Amino acid sequence: MAGAAAFVEADNAEEIMARIETKSQKIESLLKHYKHVEALKTALDGSPPKTLDERCKSANWIVVHRAIMAIKDIEGMLNSLTAEYYDILMKYLYRGLSTGDEPTCEQCLMIHEKLTERAGLGCILRCLSDTTNTV
Amino acid sequence: MAVVDVHRFAESITCHAWSPDLSMVALCPNNTEVHIYKSLSQDHWERLHVLQKHDQIVSGIDWSSKSNKIVTVSHDRNSYVWSLEGAEWVPTLVILRLNRAALCVQWSPKENKFAVGSGAKTVCICYYEQENNWWVSKLIRKRHESSVTSVAWHPNNVLLATTSTDGKCRVFSTFIKGVDTKDSKAGSPAETKFGEQILQLDLSYSWAFGVKWSPSGNTLAYVGHSSMIYFVDDVGPSPLAQSVAFRDLPLRDVLFISEKMVIGVGYDSNPMVFAADDTGIWSFIRYIGEKKAASSGSSYSSQFSEAFGKFYGSQSKSTTANDASDSRGGVHDNSITSIVPLGKGGSPKVMRFSTSALCRMSSPDNNHRNECYISTNLK
């Protein structure tokens, strides 16, 4: 904890890309089975915030985006999401809002409203102030 | 039972400190002066002194309890030590050798030194040189990458914790030959070299504020601007750190009211209580004001919430002044910038504390509370 942060992720960008590939396949299959929440959780898991590689971040974003757009029941989804996911989900929501693409923004805004109710302003704060771990 | 006394001294209070007998309070009403008020009765305060020496806003005040000296630091890069001679406060300039504003100050537990955090990425440790009748400042120039927002002394009078806007909390040794005596059972040689960094904590990704040591010096607590509060137990070669994320707006300052309970104050205008349970896990308990306790969803779960609910369910809050308290249910209208204990420094438990806030109906308030573990009489 103190001092150098342990880089659990492999520094190798290729390895991360490969992992994202397998993740996206898993998510596709989960979505086919209407397991939307599972899909989102899988997408958010292992998000590579510590890599500086833009490609990895973009690749992961595409996967998360897919899962976010598939969500229909927001309340239910947030009910089954545990607290650790709130912060990372919020970061992806802001990334979604920054795209300016209408359906994405609409979906992201709806989730944002509900998520803020649950997680509070602190969650947004953590998103905004964290410039080292961006998504 | 938490009882709150509210006193309005000014539009906005930058910082404040209490006299040793708690009858007087020195505060900066967001200008270049320090006003000292004496309490004549429950609600009646009389302004006794106005200390005017600084050219810019006074950013830190500390009043030593044994030697009865006030130290003030200001954005004008100066510091004055005020001594009461007769009925007047006489200032002594302390040349800090800073080229940026001084942000915070604290007397050491033995009151023979004081530490000043500054925007010049340095910490000044000032001590009194008897031969020259002069306060000398020694700078810790290394390590800090940005402004030092807060300083806190360990009970052993040598270790100093600092927080900075680079997000890190550091512990330094401020051993000064001639002022500090080498403790025979003291730690490593690093602890006896001035300016030596003992520990650096890299828990926060954003600005860090408000560091404090627990009464025994075993635990450190500080806050990050990302609505997080960090607790570090067993500060030393292998510390145990915990990050607690909470729902609402960030905190600015914290106070240990006992070894296992911390009050945080900040942008929510409502002090928050954090406590450690028996296993040593810290978590958010509740707000002090009449506000529904936040869900423990965002902080790691605690078994305490229910127990506290029973004790504080019948809380009655009486305010003496009439503020338009907003929907948050707190007494302050705007963000609270500092929290100061009322009582002898170094005592293991704090029964009362005061908070001061910015702008619009800001006021320091005394908050009396009964510790729920031990039944003691209110002072």
Swiss-Prot record, chain A:
Q: Give this protein's Gene Ontology molecular function annotations.
A: actin binding
Q: Which InterPro entries match?
A: ARPC5 (IPR006789), ARPC5_sf (IPR036743)
UniProt lists the gene as: ARPC5B
Q: Where in the cell is it found?
A: Cytoplasm, Cytoskeleton; Cell projection
Q: How does it assemble?
A: Component of the Arp2/3 complex composed of ARP2, ARP3, ARPC1/p41-ARC, ARPC2/p34-ARC, ARPC3/p21-ARC, ARPC4/p20-ARC and ARPC5/p16-ARC.
Which domain of life, per UniProt?
Eukaryota
Q: Which organism is it from?
A: Arabidopsis thaliana
Q: What does this protein do?
A: Functions as a component of the Arp2/3 complex which is involved in regulation of actin polymerization and together with an activating nucleation-promoting factor (NPF) mediates the formation of branched actin networks. Arp2/3 complex plays a critical role in the control of cell morphogenesis via the modulation of cell polarity development.
Query: Where does this chain mainly localize?
Result: cytoplasm
Instruction: State the Gene Ontology BP annotations.
Output: Arp2/3 complex-mediated actin nucleation; regulation of actin filament polymerization
Sorted UniProt keywords: Actin-binding, Cell projection, Cytoplasm, Cytoskeleton
Taxon lineage: Eukaryota, Viridiplantae, Streptophyta, Embryophyta, Tracheophyta
The name this protein carries in UniProt is Actin-related protein 2/3 complex subunit 5B
Which cellular component appears as one GO term in the record? cell projection
Query: What Pfam families does its record include?
Result: P16-Arc
Homology family: Belongs to the ARPC5 family.
